[in-house]
Amino acid sequence: LANGGVTTLQILPGSANLFGGRSVTLKNVPARTMQGMKFPDAPQGLKMACGENPKRVYGSKGREPSTRMGNMAVNRQTWIKAREYQKKRAAGKEQTRDLGMETLADVLEGKIMVHNHCYRADEMANVIDMSKEFGYKVSTFHHAVESYKIADLLRENGICSALWGDWYGFKMEAYDGIKESIPLVH
């Protein structure tokens, strides 16, 4: 019997890194450990980000990425490395174990869903293009205030948007949000 309220939680890493880390899906039940709360057979997820957060965090330290183009370039370089890692793993070739590359290889094999923190329509479209180039699936764009601009593209690719109903304009990449966004994307 469900009486409403929150029944399931997806816990994701933050949005400072292009590749933030894995998520976990939990049932909102009393348990002594996280393992006791895990939602049975829930798909695994990977949090990614684009836009201002990664470029601000790394660019302010004089590191890559420091621009939006840099975000995409580092993403592409990383997916190329992941594909090579995946090919060697599939061929049974010996290589140094790399947990990050294992995660990305699992994304490329469809075992892990991608959740991308991305506000702007142009960046979402670029991420979709990259996902097609490397053969992975983007499940959801989070904070995607410009989803309404590419609702048809999102629909064609089976991608969800996790949106706020009435919060936008609080930073540069959120300026083009509109209150009608959710009905336009639905």
Feature names for model-found ranges:
Residues 3-140:
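Polyanionic/metal-chelating signatures
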Residues 113, 152-186:
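His/Asp/Glu-enriched, well-ordered alpha-helical/loop segment
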Residues 121-123, 144-149, 169:
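Short acidic loop-to-helix transition motifs that present clustered carboxylates
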Residues 100, 123, 147, 177-178:
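Amphipathic coiled-coil/heptad-repeat helices and related helical stalk/stem segments
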Residues 136-143, 160-165:
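Short hydrophobic/aromatic-enriched beta-strand-loop microsegments
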Residues 2-3, 174:
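Aromatic/His-enriched, Gly/Pro-containing loop or helix-boundary segments
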Residues 18-20, 149, 171-172:
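Short secondary-structure boundary/hinge segments and terminal tails
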